[in-house]
Curated annotation (Swiss-Prot):
Gene Ontology CC terms, in alphabetical order: mitochondrial inner membrane; mitochondrion
Name this protein carries in UniProt: ADP,ATP carrier protein
Residue span of region Important for transport activity: 257-262
UniProt repeat feature Solcar, residue ranges: 25-118, 130-222, 230-316
Subunit structure comment from the entry: Monomer.
Protein function: ADP:ATP antiporter that mediates import of ADP into the mitochondrial matrix for ATP synthesis, and export of ATP out to fuel the cell. Cycles between the cytoplasmic-open state (c-state) and the matrix-open state (m-state): operates by the alternating access mechanism with a single substrate-binding site intermittently exposed to either the cytosolic (c-state) or matrix (m-state) side of the inner mitochondrial membrane.
Organism the protein comes from: Schizosaccharomyces pombe (strain 972 / ATCC 24843)
Modulation of this protein's activity: The matrix-open state (m-state) is inhibited by the membrane-permeable bongkrekic acid (BKA). The cytoplasmic-open state (c-state) is inhibited by the membrane-impermeable toxic inhibitor carboxyatractyloside (CATR).
Motif (Nucleotide carrier signature motif): 257-262
InterPro entries in UniProt: ADT_euk_type, Mit_carrier, Mitochondrial_sb/sol_carrier, Mt_carrier_dom_sf
Note on domains (UniProt): The transmembrane helices are not perpendicular to the plane of the membrane, but cross the membrane at an angle. Odd-numbered transmembrane helices exhibit a sharp kink, due to the presence of a conserved proline residue.
Keyword Transmembrane: yes
Keyword Transmembrane helix: yes
Parts of the chain that traverse the membrane: 27-54, 95-119, 128-148, 198-219, 233-253, 293-313
Amino acid sequence: MATSSAAAAASTPVNANTITETKNSTFFFDFMMGGVSAAVSKTAAAPIERVKLLIQNQDEMIRAGRLSHRYKGIGECFKRTAAEEGVISLWRGNTANVLRYFPTQALNFAFKDKFKKMFGYKKERDGYAKWFAGNLASGGAAGAASLLFVYSLDYARTRLANDAKSAKKGGERQFNGLVDVYRKTYRSDGLRGLYRGFGPSVVGIVVYRGLYFGMYDTLKPVVLVGPLEGNFLASFLLGWAVTTGSGVASYPLDTIRRRMMMTSGEAVKYSSSFECGRQILAKEGARSFFKGAGANILRGVAGAGVLSIYDQVQLLMFGKKF
């Protein structure tokens, strides 16, 4: 009897260690699959991403003398950029974007379930409203937590993508590459310059990621059932719809933060995100908050792909169900 008790006691730490190792292994796979899917999809959508940023920030570029006249639309922006800078320039800033997006998306996917468990809401026990709110909160918290670590890369990506050949300096660019963005910004504005627009970014990421993950997790078990369960196209379309809705809802905040980013290194800066929004509304009208939103919707295809591919790979490799 004593022997059995001793054996049972001795086996307890082993079982605990095994459980811990399994959890760590799952966390690692979540991290890697989310990151790889994100990197591939963002590279595929890089030309759309750059066009979106050029249209969104064109007024700041004109004020700084880096753009001669406004773009007439998505198609004209594509054509003009390719003609003036070459087709390869449509991927300008993509390296910084991949470096930023890999840890951001990977951390979002990896920590999403952990944040969800922290809220501890169950649909059957706590009701649909609390369960839905928990999904929104967990998605938002995951996005906001990772933003702090990668914001400077997002800033660098934005500056590189909007670094069109100068309209006043014979085609000269402002930055020579990723490292040059950091060097020049830090020299002119200090660390603060790399984090300009961080405030509205935090609010925007909570709104976007909260809806992005929260609504997808909530709608998945309702929509993707019966013949649609495990269907790649259905999963892709659901992800695209969620991405589009989330992007439109948070787009004005995205415009404000990127317009603030564009003033680092410039003589005139916005005193706050509120002041930035006020000036855009007064000088350019409400429509300016949504400049580039059309390209952003097209870019949403990449986000939908990340969600659906992630689900399919997990289902194939680990048998994880919706």
